[in-house]
Amino acid sequence: MATALGFRCLYRTRPATLGRYVDRLWRSPSRGHRLSPADDELYQRTRISLLQNEFPQAVYIDSYNSRGFTINGNRVFGPCALLPQTVVQWNVGSHQDITEESFSIFWMLEPRIEIVVVGTGNKTERLHSQVLQAMRQRGIAVEIQDTPNACATFNFLCHEGRVTGAALIPPPGETALASSGQTTE
């Protein structure tokens, strides 16, 4: 704005030879520093990026019961997907509902997740081979365990500083883990 105002003043009080140059600058379209979304390389990526270096705190599972999980002091009801600094609801009912699409959130992140710990409820269940194949093709290891052991494994890997995710289904029935000072109602 200040530059344009300076050119206007210069244009009005110009000598004849400077006029053509200033006139051409004044009337030519200029985009300046503004970029359209197509010009910006970061706009063209198709991945989501949730990890940030400014927030180095990790996600830890405090407790779980048949209704859900307590993660960093916050209650999450039902199945959930844990990312290095984020928790999201996971829309699966049982291990049989787990598909490639339900795991897609784990391979969209950057930096890439090294390992995904899957908790399948009270006992360890097998996943479809296509799901495991898709994760292997993307370079992500999958560890399938019952939910109590998956919670412990996830906390251990986070404590080690590994870039890990978890896909957890709450164990049915009365199986529960409460951290000190919490009840398992």
From Swiss-Prot:
InterPro entries (alphabetical): MTH938-like_sf, NDUF3, NDUFAF3/AAMDC
GO biological process, one term: mitochondrial respiratory chain complex I assembly
Key word ATP-binding present: no
Main location: mitochondrion
Keywords associated with the record: Membrane, Mitochondrion, Mitochondrion inner membrane, Nucleus
A GO-annotated cellular component: nucleus
CDD domains linked: Mth938_2P1-like (cd05125)
Tissue expr: Expressed in testis.
Localisation per UniProt entry: Mitochondrion inner membrane; Nucleus
SUPFAM superfamilies recorded: MTH938-like (SSF64076)
Gene3D superfamilies, alphabetized: MTH938-like
Description of how the protein assembles with itself and partners: Interacts with NDUFAF4, NDUFS2 and NDUFS3.
Family from the record: Belongs to the NDUFAF3 family.
Known function: Essential factor for the assembly of mitochondrial NADH:ubiquinone oxidoreductase complex (complex I).
Name recorded for this polypeptide: NADH dehydrogenase [ubiquinone] 1 alpha subcomplex assembly factor 3
Species of provenance: Rattus norvegicus (Rat)
Underlying gene: Ndufaf3
